[in-house]
Amino acid sequence: SSKGLFSKVIHQSGGSSLTNRSVREAHLALGHVFAQQTVGDDVDDPIRAMRQLPADTILEAADTVFKNHYFDAVVDGHSVRESIMDTLRDGKIHAVDLLIGSNDDEWLMYTGDQPDIEGWLDAEVARSSVDTLHAILADEIDDRRKLDLLRTAKYYVCPSLVLAQEVSNVGRRAWVYHFTRQREGDLAATMGAYHGAELPYVFDTHDDWLPTVEADHRLTKVMQSYWVNFATNGNPNQSGLQPWLPFKSDSRKIQSIGDRLYSSEHPSQPLCAFLSPT
């Protein structure tokens, strides 16, 4: 059990862990194929045999067998006994304070120039919800951005809000952020507030592949103050900082962190009525 091992949680762009779709049987089948390709079928202990192989052999086979496969936690009945959503439904999460959030464009840089919105909706959303989702996004004319909003909401925003609500329900404080800062320049414009964009601000590790201007340094100081305050006290607020309201079931306030700092409902909240994990 992990109970008592931590007193607070900072969870950045991690909402997808609530909705992982890894199936044990599928992993076992891939493992069998992997063993066949590396050591064959006529081996009593394939794992031991694979451990004797050169690393290059293992990597070459993995590139073939696990191509396009997404690794995630698998409910195996031993180390992982149930899905996170089952834990939430049963009210068994640890009562600790939570700081959680995601970025405005988590999926934009991974979206091609001809996004298949209808294909994604067919695969990911109940048919009865499709027309309403189209209506919610009717004002968005850029199809790449539209698919980015849908993916970011389903895989990051909506699960994060579900977890924040459950933390609030068990009597602890949840603080939700929405990171919106886009760097200056043409390259940054193609990515927006991309997956991982908040990390240089949290750790003050700005690299030179994107421009860093005075506004970025100011935001770094603000975010580091929020994060350190939370790690210390379970509350990101302090005198002199823009107030950050806790997330609650009745108010659902999040903190927008970017060129402006302010509290509001998450702009993707309407999408979450149809895209939240259940």
Short names for language-model regions:
Residues 127-170, 175-181:
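Alpha/beta-hydrolase fold catalytic core
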Residues 158-278:
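Mobile gating loops/cap/lid regions near enzyme active sites that modulate substrate access
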Residues 1, 88-91, 194, 218:
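Structural motif
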Residues 25, 124-127, 131, 193, ...:
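Alpha-helix N-cap/helix-start motif at coil-to-helix transitions, marked by capping-box chemistry
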Residues 18, 142-148, 210-214:
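Short coil/turn segments at secondary-structure junctions
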Residues 8-11, 31, 41-42, 139-143, ...:
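Short acidic (Asp/Glu) and glycine-rich catalytic loops that position anionic groups and cofactors
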Residues 93-137, 183, 224, 256-278:
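C-terminal, loop-rich substrate-recognition/catalytic regions characterized by aromatic stacking residues
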Residues 3, 8, 12-121, 146-169:
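Substrate-access "cap/lid" subdomains that shape
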